[in-house]
């Protein structure tokens, strides 16, 4: 069977899993690589988070089996200095910690990058304590089907993610990459729990701190990427938001915003320490007040002129996340036309994307070939 047909077969199997026909089978079917260095890059955003609770080994594994080039773990730290995969340090929304009476006293209120947040925070738990918790779906109102997996998966360490990627690379006979993000580095550094030394140690220990490794390291902050540029041989990616500014710059009194960073001049500065740009997709093609796509900006062109690849985020199948152009109905949780959205952004020149729905992105690429 050809590579393309095999991958489409995997996509079809995954589609059956969505309607409950064969979820376990979808997890077992392998998918081959879909290109070399110049191919379109598909990043499994928090794994295959459209189908499994995010940042679980099950989610990462499903993304890899669906054909993702990379899986993306967001990294935070425990009280005892172990990197774990969670979208935020606050874990009330992504684990069952609220159901553990022994941890009721850990609930607290903190300032997270200038925002008041109440809940339970990874830095207040040892790894052993975190391992007693189980993950749950973060947005059950949109992804109700994912809730059948609530309570089944642990919070993984970054080392466990690396181990999984190595095992799957051997099993699937292709190299699967990792695309870790350092979450809130200034916040953790101020608590004496800097993320960067742990990240560098783990990449070194696993033989991944080399230019040929299939690794990107990303951050919404600037300072830690500049520091990592001095010690890492893997490419770095500057993440940007459609509004606001990097918190490290805000904290230092630096007036630069994400808009400044994504200007032609700002991108030239980014290219001094990074090889890629990870913008909000609305920075590539904005939406009007009604949610419809407008004209593409010059961001992709300017980034390419600065020598940067462009991997925007996040492409999701549900109507609530799609531009109005591609929604199928007013029901937030129903699928719209993610195929069409990806096609428009590929036509705008992006080099890859982050998606919760790896199977759809892979199928779109294969059908467009």
Provide a role label for each language-model segment.
Residues 2-11, 18-369:
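Phosphate-group recognition and catalysis centered on beta-loop-alpha active-site segments
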